[in-house]
């Protein structure tokens, strides 16, 4: 199976190997740390040639995701890859996420991450929600009820920026811990995650419940769900890096 040009995955070619590590591991390893029985990445020429220098074969990594996507669509010809947006929409269906297939991929990814965050907020008590709003620097919250605080958090997430990226990393990290048994390298930045570490508990519990139901649906989803969440987070990281560069350029003028 060859890589099908996919504009939603082309940005992976711009990333460093350290960024691609999480996606590689999601595609290759299961929760027990053993290689997935049907993974083809580590037997590829690209892997044998470049090893952990993932940036050298980002296209082959994207191809592997398309391959797993084809395994979750019974209607597709075996061996023919599926474009990322179709995989993402299939994942959203499994997670019961509301979305419009005609909208931009980034918006669908945002809806997916928002759904997980929303469900984690539902599991928090009033004090936890208030604490999170304080950490996110949401102002004038003293007179807001729990529902309004949750709405403010979701609105902040959808507005984008560093706080949105921070929340996305925490959501993705909780998914990785639950599904893969380990966190993401993206979450290694303590400055990024330490202030919102309390959120990983509720998110992890929610994902555990969701995963128990989804696991029966087929082994392909054990890959495509965390892979889509990692891709969405990497895209946010790229967008945030671009915004930071623009800000620096403006300041230097």
Swiss-Prot record:
Domain of life: Bacteria
Pfam families from the UniProt entry: DUF3944 (PF13099), Ubiq_cyt_C_chap (PF03981)
InterPro entries: DUF3944 (IPR025217), Ubiq_cyt_c_chap (IPR021150)
Protein family membership: Belongs to the UPF0174 family.
Protein name: UPF0174 protein jhp_1494
């Amino acid at each position: 199976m060859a890589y099908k040009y996919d504009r939603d995955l082309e940005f992976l070619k711009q990333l460093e190997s350290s960024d691609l590590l999480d996606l590689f591991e999601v595609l290759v390893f299961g929760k027990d740390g053993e290689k997935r029985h049907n993974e083809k990445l580590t037997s590829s020429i690209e892997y044998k040639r470049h090893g952990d220098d993932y940036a050298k074969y980002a296209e082959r990594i994207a191809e592997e995701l398309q391959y797993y996507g084809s395994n979750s669509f019974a209607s597709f010809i075996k061996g023919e890859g599926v474009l990322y947006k179709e995989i993402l929409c299939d994942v959203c269906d499994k997670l019961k996420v509301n979305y419009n297939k005609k909208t931009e991929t980034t918006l669908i990814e945002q809806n997916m991450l928002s759904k997980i965050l929303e469900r984690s907020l539902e599991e928090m008590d009033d004090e936890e929600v208030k604490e999170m709003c304080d950490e996110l620097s949401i102002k004038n919250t003293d007179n807001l009820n729990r529902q309004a605080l949750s709405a403010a958090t979701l609105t902040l997430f959808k507005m984008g920026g560093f706080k949105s990226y921070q929340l996305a990393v925490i959501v993705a990290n909780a998914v990785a811990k639950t599904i893969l048994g380990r966190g993401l390298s993206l979450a290694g930045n303590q400055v990024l995650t330490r202030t919102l570490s309390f959120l990983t508990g509720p998110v992890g519990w929610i994902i555990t419940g969701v995963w128990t139901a989804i696991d029966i649906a087929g082994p392909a989803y054990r890959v495509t769900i965390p892979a889509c969440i990692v891709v969405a987070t990497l895209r946010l990281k790229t967008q945030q890096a671009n915004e930071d560069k623009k800000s620096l350029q403006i300041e230097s003028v």
